[in-house]
Amino acid sequence: MKRFVVLVLDGFGIGAMKDAAETRPGDERADTLGSILKDFPQMNLPNLERLGLMNAYGKESSQMKMSDGANFGKAELMHFGADTFMGHQEIMGTQPRKPAIHPFQESADIVAAHLRKYGHKVNIIEKQGLRYVLCDDYVTIADNLEADLGMCYNVTAPLDFISFERECEIGRLVREVVTVGRVIVFGGIGNTMADLWNAEEIRNGQFIGIASAKSRSYERGYQCIHMGYGVDESVQVPVCLTDMGIAVTLIGKVADIVQ
């Protein structure tokens, strides 16, 4: 088998889907390529042009034309919401399931009970009537404040005090009982629980979590894994090819969100 490359240009869209006005009002005019060309009409991307970028776009610019030798196509997404993680999973072979969208408040009790069932120490942290979970003294489980609110939960820890592997075990237990799109497990070294407490924020009176950047988790030794709702890695291209003895290399962001 010759080398095969999947290049993901995240957010580099070529137009809106038919239901954009209904499902995401304001996005019905989304056209990243068109917007870039409007401001930079002289932009020239020869490799993408040769591969069929303008063929898929359906029109040409002053510098980039349709390619006679290109095999090209375009597809509407099947997953729900604007979610880069599920977009990657869909490209790799996952049939998306519709996740729930709700604050961690609605999941706190079931998450706490499930963790206790497996022998973990669990404390409920409450601020201004909102709750989140502290597990084994060093792992917070709360709302993600960076994506659309209610789409994801974060599992955050300072990795000088607990291993990433143990944090992932906790994350998998959370994933077993919640139906939001993603459970994001991450941490770094060099920070402490004091940094996490200082990064605690409340949004819209409904969501409480640890602001990722303020937690200092990104500064040193950052590790992260995204656990998607209904994602079965065994049917995805990287695992299938690996099982066939074909080497697969994940480079960049995709290495964090595709297994």
Predicted segment positions?
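Short beta-strand segments
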Residues: 8, 92, 186-188
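Catalytic-site neighborhoods of secreted/periplasmic enzymes
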Residues: 89-90, 97-110, 237, 244-259
